Structures are given as C-alpha cells and as structure tokens.
C-alpha cells in the first residue's frame, strides 16, 4: 500500500500535463485472431468492448540502436490490426495491458504486404466501419510518431527481435469517443481497412 501511494505521487508528476514523447505499452497476444473470426465477448467480465484500427509493422531483422534514417531497412512488411479493448478493464486497473490482452483481442490480417509493395507507409488511408457505418477515417500521415521514429525510439535501449509486431496507434472515432460512448454489441461486424493492404 505504501509503495502504491508513492508510485501514485510519481505517476501524477511524471505522466500528468503535456506529453512531448510517444506513449508505448505492451499487448499480450496469445494467438492472433484471423480475418473473419469472431472476437469473444467475455460476458460478466467485459461490458464496454471497443475497436481500434491500426497499421501493424513487422520487423524482418533484429533491431538495436537503429537510427530513424535507417529504420526502414528493418521492416519486413505491414498488416492490419484491430486493437480490441475492454474499456472497463482499462478504467478499473488504470492501465492498458489487461484490457487489451484477453484471448482473441488481436484480430490481424488479412495478409502481410512486404515493405517494397507499400512504398510510403506514412501516406496510407485507414478506416473502420461497424455494421457498415463509417466510424474511423484518417491517414497514416497524421500519426503522432512515424513508423521509423517508433522503431528508433523503441530500439534505443532494447533489442526488437525479428518478427516483432508494432501496432502504431489508432485514429479518432473509437466507440469510447462517441457521444454518448457506443460500444460493440453481440453480432456487430467490424471491418478495418488500410490502403494497399486490404480489409480485416
């Protein structure tokens, strides 16, 4: 309890106010959910299920101390990730990990497109529909941090192994941000799409 209190004071000082640096966090993936598969509801545990369309970056080589200028050489390819999130668990535990890491919470696909086929990864349209209604519509040029910038920052003090997948964040339009908040219901069909990759 005492450590929780002192950590709380530190968190308020360290994480409050403006955020000049990118926020990174881990997401456990027991098994990626294939395109077309259902996402589990977890009745009784999850009451606010949400979607997040994101560009996924797959590394093809171990990366350590990589510069932003050279980071592109470490990218094998790209895919689409729907970063399914249980908002009530995020709120309850005051962090992202558990609410994003339940089994089945990482739909990924429908394929991997190699980096040479994508070209400029910072110029891709990204969208998400729920039951045909457009909820998210943006472009990767609006990302807070570039793909290469994220690889450079993350590899400063740790090795990113070949095969590492980086989800690069989601644009506005998630259910949590709607007024009133509108979360996923049983039977909803979510389609995440990214230019040059396809739809998940």
Model-derived segments and spans:
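Catalytic-pocket segment enriched in acidic/His residues
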Residues: 87-200
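Active-site microenvironments in enzyme catalytic cores
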Residues: 1-134, 185
């Amino acid at each position: 309890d005492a450590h929780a209190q002192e950590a709380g004071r530190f968190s308020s000082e360290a994480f409050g106010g403006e955020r000049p640096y990118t926020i990174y966090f881990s997401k456990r993936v027991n098994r990626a959910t294939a395109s077309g598969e259902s996402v589990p509801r977890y009745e009784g545990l999850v009451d606010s299920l949400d979607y997040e369309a994101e560009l996924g970056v797959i590394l093809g080589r171990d990366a350590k101390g990589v510069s932003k200028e050279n980071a592109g050489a470490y990218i094998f390819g790209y895919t689409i990730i729907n970063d399914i999130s249980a908002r009530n668990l995020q709120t309850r535990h005051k962090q992202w990990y558990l609410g994003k890491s339940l089994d089945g919470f990482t739909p990924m696909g429908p394929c991997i497109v190699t980096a040479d086929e994508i070209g400029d990864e910072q110029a891709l349209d990204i969208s998400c529909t729920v039951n045909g209604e457009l909820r998210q519509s943006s472009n990767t040029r609006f990302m807070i941090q570039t793909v290469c910038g994220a690889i450079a920052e993350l590899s400063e003090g740790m090795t990113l192994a070949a095969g590492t997948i980086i989800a690069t964040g989601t644009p506005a339009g998630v259910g949590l941000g709607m007024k009133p908040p509108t979360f996923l219901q049983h039977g909803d069909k979510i389609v995440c799409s990214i230019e040059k990759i396809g739809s998940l």
